[in-house]
């Protein structure tokens, strides 16, 4: 069990709702496929139009006694109308979508120190604010236990610091001779974040407590009692 000191904090779960590069790639591939399929359909429609260019047209529609073919034509018309409406709606949404906040630069000069007193270890994290920080900026301190190979051994815990002027924090009630990975993030808005590079730290070995109430009753040249 461990605790976080110096300021009031909240343990939070973190979900990044920003665009990722793989999301851009997926959207681009989907749109290219839609455009390609649309061109293929346009070619089919052109070919059908050429076939029936001299056919019996009444009110702009082909008079056909083939029920299956008539059903096919109606199905194409309905699906194309649905596709047109869906793409128009998506364009409208994208045009009115609010811009995502830009991630602030990460905190700088992050320093991690550890101590062990009375068989209890603690870690103190210090940092400098990012250059030109945005308004209403907050910090997050990420903390996770690791093994000697740097592999994560438990879930990552995130502490939120709501006061942007607070640039020092402590994590207490840790185990001596244990390894941890720490990083600090500067957060703007709901999810936009710039995080520092992670730092590994090992808590010191047990340091015996100071002996108290030492009394000297008598002494000679060679003995002390």
UniProtKB/Swiss-Prot annotation:
Primary residence: secreted
Source organism superkingdom: Eukaryota
UniProt keyword Secreted present: yes
Record's GO cellular component terms: extracellular region
CDD domains xrefs: FN3
PROSITE patterns (alphabetical): FN3
TM annotation in the entry: none
Residue ranges of domain Fibronectin type-III in the record: 106-206
Secreted as UniProt keyword: yes
Entry keyword set: Secreted, Signal
Residues making up the signal peptide according to the UniProt record: 1-17
Tissue: Component of the organic matrix of calcified shell layers like nacre and prisms.
InterPro entries: FN3_dom (IPR003961), FN3_sf (IPR036116), Ig-like_fold (IPR013783)
Subcellular location: Secreted
Protein name stated in the entry: Fibronectin type III domain-containing protein
Species for this entry: Mytilus californianus
